[in-house]
């Protein structure tokens, strides 16, 4: 008996003028997600999804490439203006913002939404190399 073929749902192109670019920059990777104003995903990319492996994922260049890929995909769907919210301590924060601007998106605001603990859990110990 042959396996039943399931119909794949086609991605619907949304026409969105303005949205929010969420840049999550960790020590190991950079994720760029572009949403509409309500928070529904329009486009996303990450350094790992572009083929960077290991320590190369955490570089500013990888963050730049991820931001360019997400911006291109969002601009194909009609995105022109974007607010940027940056989260995390990683190396690719500024590089990703510059790449969004260079790709042709107009940045209207930049917010830093890095969560800061009010003395929560104990942080990881310092590395000794």
From Swiss-Prot:
Located on the platform of the 30S subunit, it bridges several disparate RNA helices of the 16S rRNA. Forms part of the Shine-Dalgarno cleft in the 70S ribosome. Belongs to the universal ribosomal protein uS11 family. InterPro entries: Ribosomal_uS11, Ribosomal_uS11_bac-type, Ribosomal_uS11_CS, Ribosomal_uS11_sf. Pfam families: Ribosomal_S11. Gene3D superfamilies: Ribosomal protein S11. Coiled coil: none annotated. GO terms for molecular function: rRNA binding; structural constituent of ribosome. The lineage of its organism: Bacteria, Bacillati, Bacillota, Bacilli, Lactobacillales. It comes from Lactobacillus gasseri (strain ATCC 33323 / DSM 20243 / BCRC 14619 / CIP 102991 / JCM 1131 / KCTC 3163 / NCIMB 11718 / NCTC 13722 / AM63). Part of the 30S ribosomal subunit. Interacts with proteins S7 and S18. Binds to IF-3. GO terms for cellular component: ribonucleoprotein complex; ribosome. This is Small ribosomal subunit protein uS11. It comes from the Bacteria. HAMAP family: Ribosomal_uS11 (MF_01310). Signal peptide: none annotated. Keywords: Ribonucleoprotein, Ribosomal protein, RNA-binding, rRNA-binding. One of its GO terms (biological process) is translation. The gene is rpsK.
